[in-house]
Each structure stands twice: as C-alpha cells, then as structure tokens.
Amino acid sequence: MSNGSDFISPDVAPDELQSAVSWDAILAGAAASIAMLFVLLSLCAGFGLKVSPRWPGGVSAEDFTPIVGAAFVACQIVASMLGGYLAGRLRTKWLHVHDHEVHFRDTAHGLLAWAASVVGLLLLGVLAAPDTTTATPSPAEMLRAAHIGAQLSLFLGVGALTSAFSASVAAAIGGMRRDDMHRLHRTMR
C-alpha cells in the first residue's frame, strides 16, 4: 500500500522522468502557425485580387502561377517560423541537459510543430474539399490544369522544405531566448 510518498512533483522530478518533448508547446506552435498561414494567405489573396485587374486583358493562370507559388512559399516560411519560435519558447525547462542536447531538442520541437501544422492543414483540406462530381473537362483543360497543378506542387514542396527548416531554426532561437530569460531572472534573485 502506498502512503503517497511515491508521488514525485514535476518540479523536482528526476531527469529520467522528465519528457524531452513538450507537446503543449508543440501544439501551441502548430496552432499559431496555422492561424498565421490563414491570415497571410488571406492578405496575399486580397493583394492578388486587387492587382490582377490592372493588367490589360487579365492575367492568365500560367502567368499568375509563379506569383501564387512564391506567395505560398513566403507565407509558409513566415508562419512556420512563428510556430517554431513559440514551440521553442514555450517548452519546459530541461534540467541537467547539455547545451547541445537542448539545441537538438529545440530544433526537434520546431520540426514537430511544423509537422503538426501540416497534418492539421491536411485534415482541414480533406474536410473542406468540395465534391468533384461535376462535368468531365476536355483533355486540353485537363492538361492545362495538370500543368498548373504541377507548378503549384513544386512551389508547395519547396515551401514545405524551407518552412520545416525555418521552424527548426526559429525554435532553437526561441529556446535560447527562453533559457537566457530564465538565467537572467535567476541571477536577479
């Protein structure tokens, strides 16, 4: 029978019992990343709609695809950096862990926040996808759509890779800032 002495407070838990992964920080970073991505994409869409009528005869999809792709890449990077920074900054303090391990864990938190935001966006995309039971397009329209889709996929892939890296770097920066603030408050006591 336990008399309650088995309970270990998280504040004084041995290092072996402390998790290296702070899921609360990761999910908070992912949520912030998704929210920021929606805001940035809305701004880009509004800017694109505002600018597109200025071209005589409108803008063809082939001409507009690189612009949209570059906007997607930029939005992904900025949103992922925010999510990664928050994941690194909000994580718990690890005691008795070497600086190299802290840096690795911070970058892992950024990468996990990025991955969680990608999974969240995929789930939102599946839930919001329209029913595709419309008329069959002509072969020329299908070829044109495939060409545009391939270009956008390339931009989204580049954006995904660069935003994963950006989230990891931002998490390392956020973690360093968190640890620096912790040291500063400790010396002021």
Pin down the residues of each PLM region:
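Perimembrane loop-to-helix junctions flanking transmembrane segments
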Residues: 51-65
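Alpha-helical transmembrane segments of multi-pass membrane proteins
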Residues: 32-49
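Functional transmembrane-helix hotspots
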Residues: 122-140
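Mid-bilayer segments of alpha-helical transmembrane spans in multi-pass integral membrane proteins
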Residues: 77, 81, 85, 110, ...
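Interfacial helix-start motif at the membrane-water boundary
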Residues: 62-76
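Juxtamembrane interface at the cytosolic side of transmembrane helices
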Residues: 165-189
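Alpha-helical transmembrane segments and their helix-start/interface "positive-inside/aromatic belt" motifs
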Residues: 16-35, 68, 103-119, 169
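Short, membrane-exposed interhelical loops at transmembrane-helix boundaries
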Residues: 59-60, 138-152
